[in-house]
UniProtKB/Swiss-Prot annotation:
HAMAP family: Ribosomal_eS6 (MF_00512). This is Small ribosomal subunit protein eS6. GO terms for cellular component: ribonucleoprotein complex; ribosome. Keywords: Ribonucleoprotein, Ribosomal protein. Pfam families: Ribosomal_S6e. GO terms for molecular function: structural constituent of ribosome. Part of the 30S ribosomal subunit. It comes from the Archaea. The keyword Ribonucleoprotein applies. One of its GO terms (biological process) is translation. InterPro entries: Ribosomal_eS6, Ribosomal_eS6_arc, Ribosomal_eS6_CS. Belongs to the eukaryotic ribosomal protein eS6 family. It comes from Thermococcus kodakarensis (strain ATCC BAA-918 / JCM 12380 / KOD1) (Pyrococcus kodakaraensis (strain KOD1)).
Amino acid sequence: MATFKLVISNPKNGVAKQVEISGPEADKLIGRRIGEEIPASELGLNLSEIFGEEIPADAKLKITGGTDKDGFPMRPDVHGPRRVKILLSRGPGFRPRERGERRKKTVHGNTISPNIVQVNMKIVF
């Protein structure tokens, strides 16, 4: 059984809340990829209760990223639930210090697996 910390962002007001899920609800996330949308009710979440404002019951959550147990970020362009060392020039996992800089960095693939700890999501109305 997996346990995930979900960081759910509300793009309308810029507020983010952290929720922890485990058990069968968390198992529904395994195998999902960055960019996929999941109904909040499928994960057993009541968004109106979490955010303290009126959010439609049919709202979906879009996976935007996450990190694995060792802190390596997920990248949407690396396929599969694996960790890989790639040459980066920009994007998640690398912030260049000067123009044109490239560096090899370790990142996690775009698929959620049991070794993912944090999953970032945003509400899609």
